[in-house]
C-alpha cells in the first residue's frame, strides 16, 4: 500500500470530508498538485468546484438574507469563497497532511501554502459532484463545512478565523482568554503533526490537531466554539 493509498483509505479523512467516494481515484486526483503531473492533477476539478461553490454559496445567501441587495450579497459571497476562507476550510478538514505534492514542492512548504489548500478544497467539491451526480448532497456537505462561518457572517463583516472569534466571544463576556499549549509533535519537518491543548475557563481541556501549530490552535478553537454555541 502506498502512502497516497493509505491517505485515501483513511477513514478519518473521509469522515472529515463527510463523503465516501465510490470512485476513490477522483479523491486522489483532487489531492494531486500540478508539481506531481502536468496531466494528472486537480486543476480541472478545481475549475468545476469553483463554479459549484459559487452557486452553492450564492443560493444560500439569497435565501438566508432576503432583504439584502445584490451588492451586499456579492460582497458576502466574495468573503466566503476567497482564498483565505477556503484555506480555513482546508484547515478544518486537515487537508495539508493529505496533499500529493512533488518532493520539491513539499520541501518548499507547499503543504502549508494557502493557495494550494484553497485550490484543493475546490477540487474536492468538483470530485464529490462527479462521483455522486447529486447537487443537493454536495450542497449539504459544503454548507456543513461552512457552518462555523455562516453562523457568524453579516453583510458588513469579514470572515474571521476560529481563534479570533473565540477571543471576541470570551472578551464580550469578560472571561479570561484561552490558553494554548503544544502537547505533542510527531514526525520531522516538513512532515510534522501538532497536537495542541486549549484551556478555557469553565470547560474541559480541548485538543486540536494540524500540520502546524497555527492550524492545530485553530482546530482547537473551532471545537470550543461548537461547545460554547450549542
UniProtKB/Swiss-Prot annotation:
Among Pfam families, the record links this protein to: dsrm (PF00035), Ribonucleas_3_3 (PF14622)
GO terms for biological process?
Answer: mRNA processing; rRNA processing; tRNA processing
Chief localization class? cytoplasm
Q: What is its EC number?
A: 3.1.26.3
What EC class does the entry list?
A: hydrolase
Binding sites annotated in the UniProt record for Mg(2+): 46, 119, 122
RNase III domain residues: 10-133
Keyword tags: Cytoplasm, Endonuclease, Hydrolase, Magnesium, Metal-binding, mRNA processing, Nuclease, RNA-binding, rRNA processing, rRNA-binding, tRNA processing
Quaternary structure (record):
Homodimer.
Q: What protein name is recorded for this chain?
A: Ribonuclease 3
Primary gene name: rnc
Amino acid at each position: 500500500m502506498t502512502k497516497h493509498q493509505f491517505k485515501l483509505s483513511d477513514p478519518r479523512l473521509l469522515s472529515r470530508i463527510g463523503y465516501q467516494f465510490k470512485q476513490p481515484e477522483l479523491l486522489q486526483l483532487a489531492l494531486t498538485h500540478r508539481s506531481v503531473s502536468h496531466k494528472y492533477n486537480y486543476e480541472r476539478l478545481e475549475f468545476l468546484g469553483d463554479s459549484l461553490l459559487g452557486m452553492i454559496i450564492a443560493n444560500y445567501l439569497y435565501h438566508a438574507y432576503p432583504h439584502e441587495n445584490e451588492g451586499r450579497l456579492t460582497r458576502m459571497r466574495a468573503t466566503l469563497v476567497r482564498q483565505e476562507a477556503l484555506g480555513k476550510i482546508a484547515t478544518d478538514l486537515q487537508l495539508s497532511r493529505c496533499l500529493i505534492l512533488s518532493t520539491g514542492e513539499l520541501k518548499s512548504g507547499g503543504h502549508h501554502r494557502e493557495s494550494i489548500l484553497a485550490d484543493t478544497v475546490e477540487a474536492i467539491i468538483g470530485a464529490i459532484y462527479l462521483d455522486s451526480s447529486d447537487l443537493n448532497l454536495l450542497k449539504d456537505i459544503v454548507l456543513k463545512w461552512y457552518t462555523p462561518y455562516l453562523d457568524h457572517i453579516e453583510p458588513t463583516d469579514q470572515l474571521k478565523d476560529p481563534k479570533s472569534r473565540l477571543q471576541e466571544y470570551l472578551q464580550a463576556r469578560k472571561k479570561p482568554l484561552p490558553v494554548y499549549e503544544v502537547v505533542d509533535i510527531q514526525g520531522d519537518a516538513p512532515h510534522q503533526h501538532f497536537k495542541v491543548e486549549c484551556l478555557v475557563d469553565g470547560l474541559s481541556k480541548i485538543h486540536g490537531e494540524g500540520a502546524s501549530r497555527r492550524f492545530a490552535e485553530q482546530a482547537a478553537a473551532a471545537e470550543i466554539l461548537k461547545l460554547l454555541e450549542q
